[in-house]
Amino acid sequence: MGKNFLLEIGTEEMPAHFIDPAIRQMYDFSLEYFKNKKISLESVKIWATPRRLVVYIENLGEKQEAQEEEIRGPAAHIGYKDGMWTEVAKRFVEQYGASLEDLHIEETPKGKYIFLRKVKEGMNTLEILPDYITSLLKSIRFPKMMKWGDVDFYFGRPIRWIVALYGDTEIEVEIAGVKSSRYSRPPRFLPQIPIEIRDADSYLNVMRENYIIVDQEERKNEILKQINKIANENSFILDYEDDLLKEVNYLVEYPTALLGEFDKKYLALPEVVLIITMEKKQRYFPLRDADGNLTNKFIVIRNGTDNYKDIVIQGNEKVLKARLSDAEYYYHEDTKHPLEKYTEKLSGIIFQEQLGTIKDKVERVRILVREIANILGLSSEENKILERSVNLYKADLGTLMVSEYPELHGIMGRIYAKISGEKDPIPEVIGEYIYPRTLDDRLPSNFLASILGIADRIDSLTGYFALDLFPTGSEDPIGLRRISGGLLRLLLESSLKLNLRNLFVKSFEIYNFGEKYPLSQIDKGMGFIGQRLRNLLLDRYSIDIVDAVMEVGYDEMWRLKRRLDFISKFKEKESYEKLKKALNRLYRILPKDFTPKEVSENLLSSPFEKKLYEDYLKIKNEIFNDILEGNYEVLLSYDFLNEFSDDIEKFFDNVLVMSPNEDERINRLSLLSLIKLLFWEILDWSRLS
């Protein structure tokens, strides 16, 4: 029978975004550790607050399982003679503290040997737990690690106390100069009297009694209960991002929801400014009325009880008023001038130290946009809209509002463009080029915004690729993963017929690096893009489909997307298995570096190879142009594939491909190679499961 185990790591306040990754790591490590140590357990629970990381293991076994091991001893003919164990065998068992009854003889590849079957008793869990605690804390990786004082230990934030209990027994361990005990600490809003934890079983209740809700799910539900109660009692509608709830949950240990308000005059500001100020700057929950209009009310989550709540509300209202007053000033100052005026400031804003200013970037993007427009054959009106949009799309970076609220770039550009009287759809293009900002964000509704977004991201990535600023491990300070993710979604879902590699090469030319940076950096960049693309596609398609399609190239995302959609549907058809099997047979026989020649009909002697050649010509004439155009779905209704698959099988069953006659052999290999190349236009069939 096991006991419950408790480990509480008390720290200084941990940034909210550090906590979820730590929870996952602690859970995985704990399961793996005790599995490897062969100690049974019922469940592992990881709880967290801003100041505590907690492992709670239910019914952790009191000792390791006994392990049976076999030790090979001397050869049987030495240790066992005339039905008796020899002195050699006796010395062998004495060496391991065993008896002759534990010996047996087994046949091995090297002959018969004596083996000792020994049961190794498991260690007590109490002896193992100090190592578990130390190993666990050393294993956790945070987005940023820190060292404090003169201790040689790295963690997300300084460790201040450790509680470690197995049942009611203290586990003695010292980490980063902190010795474990059974005493936790109260929240900061209470007198700092240590909290005694008598045993692991009583932990949650003792913490609740001291105004600490350790379980993040319980805490989140408490927040939801309270904010919904306030909203319902006042006939308001809650409207907030999911990330806000997650962040607030990791900012408090004992949540209390309070209703505050601000001056109605600030409702004249753009709604997005109010929401960003409340959600991002202050972590408040905005409230709407029954008609969906934003109100001048908000909910703040206090870390503590409702004692002195009026003072707390007034303090939060005062802080919000100051922020909104600043925003009002920025807005009024910004709107004194048309948006175009702020383009003058772009030459003073650095894009990247070695890649120039934002103005330099705009000029590069302008050339790239013209190139894309030419490739796509845009109309003169569409070209004019794009030209004007390029002029203005970074202008809001020169405004006061975006200087204070960088996350509003593009969004304020759209608002200011409308106020400045820019004609539709220019404000829309300016405001939407930023999307998607994350992998699950929305896409632009206007394809011209997609073009601008593609050009902007291509320019950024080309510069970073040239400078070799690739992410290392989990670190990605420039945000290459985010930028490339947005680019890939635009290319995959916009269906614009563009070649990604060619755009990178063109962008590289526009930068005019000269001999400073090699063009080969684009190859390295495409490798990085390929890995990002594969990860993105694996969320939607099976691994064999993704690898089969990517193997034939991913320069043209529109083709890749069509190939993926085609094979996903084709897999459901009866002809799929036959064609895959036939083509795989063909793939296996072709030498890797074989270069096909033109097939000579005069050398086709067998009726089976003649028929296969006719099949090849038929497919080439009837649907190959469709395949080249990316119309792969024509194959879904192409009934000839069944007959073609049968003819490949008949060819292999009746024709000697590797003929002793060299001309005949090369001719047959050339026919097979041409068939492979024809279907290679779609995917690598050998990778399909």
UniProtKB/Swiss-Prot annotation:
- Annotated compartments: Cytoplasm
EC assignment: the record states 6.1.1.14
- GO molecular function terms here? arginine-tRNA ligase activity; ATP binding; glycine-tRNA ligase activity
Which Pfam families does the UniProt record give?
A: DALR_1, tRNA_synt_2f
The record's listing under InterPro entries reads: DALR_anticod-bd (IPR008909), Gly-tRNA-synth_bsu (IPR015944), Gly-tRNA-synth_heterodimer (IPR006194)
A cellular component term (GO) from this record? Answer: cytosol
This protein's major location comes to cytoplasm
Q: Which UniProt keywords apply?
A: Aminoacyl-tRNA synthetase, ATP-binding, Cytoplasm, Ligase, Nucleotide-binding, Protein biosynthesis
GO biological process annotations for this chain's record?
arginyl-tRNA aminoacylation; glycyl-tRNA aminoacylation
Q: Give the main EC class.
A: ligase
Q: Does the keyword Chloroplast apply?
A: no
**Top-level taxon in the UniProt lineage:** Bacteria
SUPFAM superfamilies found in the cross-reference section: HD-domain/PDEase-like (SSF109604)
Methyltransferase among keywords = no
What reaction gets catalysed by this protein?
tRNA(Gly) + glycine + ATP = glycyl-tRNA(Gly) + AMP + diphosphate
Q: What binding partners and quaternary form does the record give?
A: Tetramer of two alpha and two beta subunits.
Family statement: Belongs to the class-II aminoacyl-tRNA synthetase family.
- According to UniProt, the name of this protein is Glycine--tRNA ligase beta subunit
* Protein's organism: Dictyoglomus thermophilum (strain ATCC 35947 / DSM 3960 / H-6-12)
